[in-house]
Amino acid sequence: GFVSITMVAVLGFGFTQIDKFGIIRAKGIIIEDENGRDRILIGSPIPFSKDRVRTDTTLVRQYWAKQFKNPDQYMEWYKKYKNSAEGIVFMNEKGFDVVQVGDNLSDANIGKRMFRSTGILWNTQTGWERGGAGVNTTKDGKSRPTIGLDDDAGEALHLICLEDGSKGIVIGGENGSLRIGMAKKEGELFQNKGKFSGIQYFDNKGNLIWEQNMDSATKNKQ
């Protein structure tokens, strides 16, 4: 009767075959929030988003250009900045990039990158870059892993390993930078001729003001 039919129906639904997909191929994916705004862009390169501030020059002028003495000059510079990325871009509800993960990541909104950036970048809620971690690759194919933290003034604290063997911590400030680390002869980071293990202070023009080299101190004691 009715009970038998119901049981058959329940058992039938219980053993219904479920389709599974092992691979999904797509040129790009846009994930929206509950209000229909684009929030996550996935692709290689990432797809265009109508809600993204970085690709809307009207919003760029409104939010960022006004922070500079010459907004028109900033907009001219901005035309040359790279806004694309190969990976994932997370945006907040106002359309600002807050996190990027992947390869060939976007330029900062204050200047072009000198290297191809692979890794992760994070920004403030209004799109100003505040740090990142990953590998920077030069045009000639050399790679250098870095971890960086920025503040309102620019580069604040960076952990760097260069391809010439130099490795160190760079603390930047308004008047110059403090560099702590080690390097082989002719190191780029510490501008050293011989081996270096110690600390240096450079002014904001790149001139060496003071240093303490442990390698030199050790040689003098021998």
Regions found by a protein language model. Give the residues of each.
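Parallel beta-helix/beta-solenoid repeats that form elongated, surface-exposed shafts/blades used
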Residues: 17-222
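Single-pass membrane-anchoring alpha-helices
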Residues: 1-18
